[in-house]
Design a protein with these regions (language model features):
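Membrane-helix interface "capping/anchor" motifs
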Residues: 77-88, 141-154
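Membrane-interface capping segments at transmembrane-helix boundaries
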Residues: 84, 190-200
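Loop-to-transmembrane alpha-helix initiation sites
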Residues: 124-132, 153, 171-184
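Hydrophobic alpha-helical segments embedded in the membrane of multi-pass proteins
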Residues: 67-70, 87-96, 126-139, 154-162
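Hydrophobic alpha-helical transmembrane segments in multi-pass integral membrane proteins
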Residues: 100-110, 162-175
């Protein structure tokens, strides 16, 4: 979050996949802005689902390969190192907001059932870009900041998802999930204490 605020011109420009990057001097490597620029201006992405799943687009390192991230998430959940409740509620909240309130031009005012397929494409684009899936696997389940009780984890995921989409829709930084996590982490302890008092 600090690097994004301090150096946005350098932080949010990425080399295209399969670009040869020299070991010592990478200043000559052409970089481009992320696909978040297209989404924030109301456009639709021209990438196939396979390209998005494999991470074949300019994105922060490690956040684009959705299949690898899902495999890592399944491994962590099978080893009991991560709880699914916070991640699933986070992704479900992001998906619902993207489906019912899409950023793409003309879709928000259209009938939901008539334009269900373009809305589902918006959900795909929002979940597979902007480090959303990376955050669901690795950042949401941080044991020291995530709520410890089940209902608290669900509420934690919903709040992080709603604030993330708010930052993505109205903010200037594509990885708004970092700021959403910082915001909700400040009340995660309170959520645990409240749930303990309610069920005690």
């Amino acid at each position: 979050a600090v690097a994004a605020v301090s150096w946005p011109e350098q932080v949010f420009r990425y080399p295209q996949p399969y670009t040869a990057i020299p070991l010592w001097d990478a200043s000559g490597v052409p970089v481009s802005s992320a696909i978040e620029d297209t989404l924030s201006s109301g456009g639709m992405l021209n990438y196939s689902s396979i390209a998005l799943s494999l991470g074949e687009y300019a994105a922060p390192m490690g956040t684009g390969a959705a299949l690898v991230l899902l495999a890592c998430g399944l491994f962590l959940w099978s080893q009991k190192d991560a709880h699914m409740t916070a991640s699933v509620s986070f992704l479900a909240t992001c998906a619902l907001i993207a489906f019912f309130f899409p950023r793409q031009a003309g879709l928000a005012e259209s009938d939901v059932l008539v334009n269900a397929l373009p809305r589902l494409q918006c959900v795909r684009d929002e979940l597979l870009t902007g480090a959303v899936l990376f955050s669901a696997v690795f950042l949401i389940n941080e044991p020291y900041t995530c709520a410890h009780h089940r209902m608290g984890r669900i509420l934690y995921g919903v709040l992080v998802g709603a604030i993330t989409m708010g930052f993505r829709y109205y903010g200037v930084y594509e990885t708004g999930v970092c700021f959403a996590l910082l915001t909700v982490n400040s009340i995660s302890g309170w959520m645990d204490r409240t749930e303990t008092h309610l069920y005690a």
